[in-house]
Amino acid sequence: MANKKIDFYFDISSPYSYLAHTQIRKYEKETGEKINYMPIFLGGLHRLADITAPGLNPLRGKYLIKDLKLFADKYKIKYQFNRYFPIKTIQIMRGAIVAGQNDYFQNYIDKFFIAAWVDSLN
């Protein structure tokens, strides 16, 4: 039976994208499935859908921060909520598209995810 194609739509600005990213290689090894990374611009999707990002809603934001910490603790992931949130990533995500056409894609996204969600850089 052929392996299923799984697309992972992500934006470096999303802490949930980061946490999922930290688990993907493990998942690929355990299942033999290959995950296809699909860079998106989450801010543009929010505008298109006319919604406020969950992290910018005060009530949802409090829950989001607790939920992210619980996940990070459970899976022993280095993580801290970015003090500059919401971070602007349009240029980074454009770079991810270019990196995806070259051999350095994984290194590129690893570095930016760590900068955003471990080192809390902008």
Residue ranges of predicted features:
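Extreme N-terminal starter segment of soluble prokaryotic enzymes
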Residues: 2-7
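Structural alpha/beta surface segment adjacent to cysteine/selenocysteine redox centers
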Residues: 12, 18-119
